Amino acid sequence: MNANPKFLSADAHVDAAAVAPLPNSRKVYVTGSQPDIRVPMREITQADTPTGFGGEKNPPIYVYDTSGPYTDPDAKIDIRAGLPALRQRWIEARGDTEVLPGLSSQYGLERAADPATAELRFPGLHRNPRRAQPGKNVTQMHYARQGIITPEMEYIAIRENQRRAEYIESLKSSGPNGAKLAAMMGRQHPGQAFGAAAFGANALAEITPEFVRDEIARGRAIIPANINHPESEPMIIGRNFLVKINANIGNSAVTSSIGEEVDKMTWAIRWGGDTVMDLSTGKHIHETREWIIRNSPVPIGTVPIYQALEKVNGKAEDLTWEIFRDTLIEQAEQGVDYFTIHAGVRLQYVPLTANRMTGIVSRGGSIMAKWCLAHHKESFLYEHFEEICEIMKAYDVSFSLGDGLRPGSIYDANDEAQLGELKTLGELTQIAWKHDVQVMIEGPGHVPMQLIKENMDLQLDWCKEAPFYTLGPLTTDIAPGYDHITSGIGAAMIGWFGTAMLCYVTPKEHLGLPNKDDVKEGIITYKLAAHAADLAKGHPGAQVRDNALSKARFEFRWEDQFNIGLDPDKAREFHDETLPKDSAKVAHFCSMCGPHFCSMKITQDVREFAAQQGVSETEALKKGMEVKAVEFVKTGAEIYHRQ
């Protein structure tokens, strides 16, 4: 990869691989109470069951789709124009915002006036930023606490349900055995929800708009949806909903360009990224972010202190509240949906990290720790937190309260510094909620398995059930190059215990900046972890996809096995390495066991034999054993035979 290859806005184009529909899938939309509430889902078509296995119809299944218009063949994709402003009419209809005459951040104005950035700027934005009218609060939490169900909340309820009821009805009407099939395919193991309201003994039959509103009002969930990012498709982060995942992208001083970061974003959402964080620290941070936001159907998060540090040439001690405030406004007016802010790094906690194995590993945390020590005073993020809340509620930017003192090794897990900061984050949450500002809490980090639940329990207690958003955690430190696996283990566990969103880790963690392939690997690993957590919690309908794939596997519907899986391309590639011919796609075996030792084929043979003999499967097995016993004696009762 070249260091910062030349990017020109005139040449910008979408990556063709990111816009092709997935195999046997099509984009469908479910309409809500008004015509412009059109909720996207991915419909996966299945083949009929072969006649020998019953011959029934297998209706399509529906899965959560984060890819936006990119996988819709009917959508015209032009990244120079950006995505349609899906939520614009809803925002305008509320009548509590105003269009500004122009940018109001000093840095934004400077970039707009700089001729050197002209060929890099996003050309398709033809509207000025919005802000709350004086005295107004435009957060989804504020509306929820007023008893208002917004279009965003209705959209989310439809999206979370994934047409589960319609799928069960389609099974019932699939043929004479429809009722039996519906019971089988809808079966799900009871979960253990650890107190989550929507699961366990009190599991909801479906997610309703009122339930969404209530969870937002309580602070147990957030809808990251800046009024200046109307292109975003509403989604929710909370432990009573599907576990979500975040993908990190962003350039550095030594690698990547604007074009590559836009490609990474479209690639991440294709494979299931629910949100994307732009962690750019290199050149053209402002322009890179604009391109990403205008083309993103998912919420975008940032760490504003990174850009603020660039404005003072990397010298943490030179940071000021005024520079940081201007950065917040700059990014809020672009449309950033949530800010990671390390306001819990207090002066008193910094000495507690002295005896750590790995010290302070968070970039934002180390920046603020250095500032606190240089000035020997509390951080300006902590001191000005109420003023930050005023900015957040003017644009509906959500807090992601950063864990600047998270452990960077399992040696440091659950130490006094980490837990002291967590307690402070709980206190800051209460302040934000006083302003009706949405909050989620960031968590570790590196934590061995036996300490993971303690992290979750303390967070729920101290932060009053505000959504938890964790980086893994990594459960061991011995696997550079495989940290997507070491962290995926911890992610599945903490997701089960109650974490609402998991921040992915790629194979490049601790080693380098991820490329597109690494992004996909991290996404798929974390989709697995999130889904495993949904199953363990007992999320309604979570097992539908597993049941459909298992049925396809038992019936040797190879194409359906590939297509229902999280990564159809890799599944097909692995199968075709040893059985590449088209005939192998309908064969009743795979290359692992071959045609004579396939356990599923043997089971099918037993069932056929039972049907022919008019006996039960148990009797058929017994009868078959008796036949084989006679055959064994007749051939000499030898365990081994010479060829």
Curated annotation (Swiss-Prot):
Its EC number is 4.1.99.17. The keyword Endoplasmic reticulum does not apply. The keyword Zinc applies. One of its GO terms (molecular function) is zinc ion binding. Substrate binds at residues 248, 277, 306, 342, 362-364, 403-406, 442, 469. Keywords: 4Fe-4S, Iron, Iron-sulfur, Lyase, Metal-binding, S-adenosyl-L-methionine, Thiamine biosynthesis, Zinc. Zn(2+) binds at residues 446, 510. Its cofactor is [4Fe-4S] cluster. It catalyses: 5-amino-1-(5-phospho-beta-D-ribosyl)imidazole + S-adenosyl-L-methionine = 4-amino-2-methyl-5-(phosphooxymethyl)pyrimidine + CO + 5'-deoxyadenosine + formate + L-methionine + 3 H(+). Pathway: Cofactor biosynthesis; thiamine diphosphate biosynthesis. One of its GO terms (cellular component) is cytosol. [4Fe-4S] cluster binds at residues 590, 593, 598. One of its GO terms (biological process) is thiamine biosynthetic process. Binds 1 [4Fe-4S] cluster per subunit. The cluster is coordinated with 3 cysteines and an exchangeable S-adenosyl-L-methionine. Catalyzes the synthesis of the hydroxymethylpyrimidine phosphate (HMP-P) moiety of thiamine from aminoimidazole ribotide (AIR) in a radical S-adenosyl-L-methionine (SAM)-dependent reaction. Belongs to the ThiC family. Homodimer. This is Phosphomethylpyrimidine synthase.
